[in-house]
Amino acid sequence: MAQKKGGGSTRNGRDSKPKMLGVKAFGGELISAGSIIVRQRGTQFHPGVNVGVGKDHTLFALVDGHVSFGVKGALNKHMVNVTPA
């Protein structure tokens, strides 16, 4: 006979890995073309001058330069720009 009861089962025991979201390059920072500026879900930050958008809403620099953040419009949208160095 068994000396211990069976272990049973659980439906827990899994978790998703971290997504590493957030601002990667801050205002005034010098970055190169193709560098990621913001990784985000949705468009919390919108692309401005010399900034591109990836399919997962990642913002990246199109030219070498300095990053700047600001707000625009009546809805105060957060904009990200890159001014060429």
From Swiss-Prot:
PROSITE patterns: RIBOSOMAL_L27. The keyword Transferase does not apply. GO terms for biological process: translation. SUPFAM superfamilies: Ribosomal L27 protein-like. This is Large ribosomal subunit protein bL27. Belongs to the bacterial ribosomal protein bL27 family. One of its GO terms (molecular function) is structural constituent of ribosome. Signal peptide: none annotated. Pfam families: Ribosomal_L27. It comes from the Bacteria. Gene3D superfamilies: 2.40.50.100. One of its GO terms (cellular component) is cytosolic large ribosomal subunit. Keywords: Ribonucleoprotein, Ribosomal protein. It comes from Variovorax paradoxus (strain S110).
